[in-house]
């Protein structure tokens, strides 16, 4: 019956024609370049039916639209939209949804424009051809070449786009003398498994290529390192956006990545050597501007017009106009065939060039941080530019231009530079004799690391990079390439206004914009403190160089006051891996303010956490790893790290980023991983017998089930392949959890992963009332997930959801209640609990949901308390101290009173408390409904 209600509720209210307009604005002002953009828009429940709604954009802009999420009644919850390239982007766009209502709710068909200016796609048995109007790209469905040709202006300007991989079986530093023996070296090329293209393309086409790397020489090595490469092509655009993902599936002790990249050939036949151009991005928009055969600076001057043309990348005047002392001696002027930029640290890059293989390299003055883009081409034959977003932040990276003096040059972007040391993913210590659970738990008491042999594996972790490829029929101006470098590193982002997102309730009802619902001086202080924390972490990322192939996007857990250094080398105090939800703080701050700094922090965390901190192959698929010195080092593999609640905002606000969508759907696999990985194997009481069974998994509602529930919720929202099963499991979980005598205070219980049903735990088989309350259960997005879940079910399902919500509200109330209240309700108190400041939002949630003004003082007492060790006090310095001289390796700003745990919870609770109960001295709750507490 519930399914029927969920399907039909609200449809009658949609029977009349609907129209609604939403403004979307640029995150950081009007972009200098727009090669196409995809963005997301939320919609209130019941407002627009999926198969009866059309979308238009202001200014006559062509718009492609699709649904990314649905409310249970079939109305649109989130939509994705694409706009093609334009030379004059507007400062904002108004997206209008309109259409007659009806009483069916099939999927929204992707709307394609009838305009001939849109993307044209051809799909045959062996290839896919996409024409944007400026670029035509051909993608192969088999072999090792992903992109067989790229045309611009009717010219073939690029071909043979493929992936390259180098690896070796050992690392030279194992030998103190630096004379390694017994190391084997391997070279691999991409091997395509399948290539697909999106449907109904008008303003954007997406080509997805999946495959693996296979040896391309005489050596013997298993195929490995599976990849997914997505190519986004927009109408009227010269740019192709590329999302490149690999999954590490090697042996850490013998599979060392020595180079990982993407390579394109550039046809140069017929172009004079002096009309062939090399451009490599330097610092702050700067460029190395050279030609394969330079004619500036020679002893004899060819003429100002000739020199100017070469330097600016235009075709030089006819040679008959040159000084003949130059033209008759061009054979003595070297041609430089190879260029190489190596960014081996976040602070410096080197460049060099040579005439050909076998000749010495000549150094070119380098600098600090390259923009990560290179161009090879000619003034008449055209060429390609290829760039990597966050190039220097993801060091060691590189750019190679090869064979530029031949008929076919090549352009290689190294995601991991072969000039660097091999990528070493072996454990950072040998186990230190921790061969029993007792020893491992004892070691936890000193380094905070939860070690266990076999669990500290990188097998199954991934990495995603974002690249841009640009095609030209002639060499572009240096100014344009500089603009493209900026676009590569900071692509434009369109977002709806915060107040509109809030009003739709499409991503939670627990946040509000600053100053709402009521403002005050104390509220402004909290706002100022949260802004300080955002800027502090932005600064720490830079000062502490939290960059690198694996590391970019993460922050560190705890500070070492004595060393004036974050604890990068101490067990569980190192890389944070989303511990206690800094992601929710950064995304929450962005949602309510539109702040670009918060967006960048959150975006980078979403990319990093979803790929590096989580598993995509093997027994741990769907789970993530607890904080540690290496992102995969800790033996705690849990859904609390991989939970999609950390990536949900990015998925929807981006218009349904496909890689993030994969990660979210993958988290459903955690249900299978729970059978293979017992999260409490080391700490379970000896008298508890537990044998993991898909029908009886012993799970914690906060650290285990909440992540799985969020994955099921998004699958239901998206109407994915498994959505009905996901919905049914959520319904069953919501119906059965309140039947546990102590509700959420039970903490851990049996979960049937086949049906979603809960039953009493093995410690309380008769359901007399178990009490297991942990400070960790509530700090990995469980409140946010439950709120979104209840919102999604909606008022029509209240009979089903209310007992579940009441059980959760009881838990939320009693967590911060006095021990006497706890004992009076449950027979005994909960003991000494931590993270009271972070849990103040649970009290606020109860106060808000039950309209209980008497709880508001408790909210702010918990939040603005005495600054216990796990919180940030109002009287904290709220400023940094400069450390310089011999006290630190380099000058840094420190705040010894800040830990990432405390900062994350201060931010999340601050955002939610202000929204749920109003400012500390101006409460928005006027009721006094103590009776509603049911205590």
What is the role of each PLM region?
Residues 20, 64-66, 503, 535-571, ...:
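Glycine- and aromatic-rich loop/turn segments at beta-sheet edges
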Residues 123-476, 480-495, 553-558, 577, ...:
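Beta-strand/loop-rich accessory regions of lumenal/periplasmic or secreted enzymes
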